[in-house]
Amino acid sequence: MLTVAMPKGRIFSEALALLKQAGYDIPDDLEHSRKLMIDVPSEQLRFILAKPMDVVTYVEHGVADVGIAGKDVLLEEERDVYEMLDLRISPCYLAVAGLPNTHVHPIAPRVATKYPNIASTYFREQGEQVEIIKLNGSVELAPLIGLAERIVDIVSTGRTLKENGLVELERIVDVTSRFIVNPVSYRMQDRAIERMVDRLTYAIEKVGENDEN
């Protein structure tokens, strides 16, 4: 039985739809279950539901053989996992945003973000020295209360930025969800994992063909 770590929330719904597209017999009530660990004996799968940032931890430490994680999490965490497949679901991107016509402090302006490693790397590559302030939620609030001049955050539709009077300043990197694998699990259960990769690849291509039509 393969243990699959899945992120709760929007990605979970899209991932389940992709698994069904790949031919997996997923119970219809799985998406609405309150359980955090769910077995699907007919497919020899066990699902662990976790916060997005925790999925890579479960896979890295081997309590999950495989998992689904956003590219943003993989870039931020830099964990020892194999990134096997771009699932092409939950597309979004990381961006720098702030209030329009904001005066940026000339010496180490402050940037609030849930992604301190990504933000630090980005501004360093831009040759800009900044002070990174790590937040765990409501990053958009930081410029409004004077905590930071800019933020680095995930943008999907841009609606949250607009509703809070913020504008996108720079686009950093595109993000989609990825299929990740524990290195030891890959050696021990390579056939089962490769079969899952093949089925998901087929589903991704099928979805792509439908989108083109």
UniProtKB/Swiss-Prot annotation:
EC number: 2.4.2.17
Any GO CC annotation of this UniProt entry: cytoplasm
Biological function: Catalyzes the condensation of ATP and 5-phosphoribose 1-diphosphate to form N'-(5'-phosphoribosyl)-ATP (PR-ATP). Has a crucial role in the pathway because the rate of histidine biosynthesis seems to be controlled primarily by regulation of HisG enzymatic activity.
Domain commentary: Lacks the C-terminal regulatory region which is replaced by HisZ.
Keyword match Transferase: yes
Top enzyme category: transferase
The gene coding this protein: hisG
Catalytic reaction(s) noted: 1-(5-phospho-beta-D-ribosyl)-ATP + diphosphate = 5-phospho-alpha-D-ribose 1-diphosphate + ATP
Gene Ontology molecular functions: ATP binding; ATP phosphoribosyltransferase activity
Recorded family membership: Belongs to the ATP phosphoribosyltransferase family. Short subfamily.
Amino-acid biosynthesis found in the keyword field: yes
Pathway(s) annotated for this protein in UniProt: Amino-acid biosynthesis; L-histidine biosynthesis; L-histidine from 5-phospho-alpha-D-ribose 1-diphosphate: step 1/9
PROSITE patterns assigned: ATP_P_PHORIBOSYLTR
Keywords: Amino-acid biosynthesis, ATP-binding, Cytoplasm, Glycosyltransferase, Histidine biosynthesis, Nucleotide-binding, Transferase
Domain of life: Bacteria
Subcellular location: Cytoplasm
One GO term of the biological process aspect: L-histidine biosynthetic process
Quaternary structure, from the entry: Heteromultimer composed of HisG and HisZ subunits.
Identification of the protein by name: ATP phosphoribosyltransferase
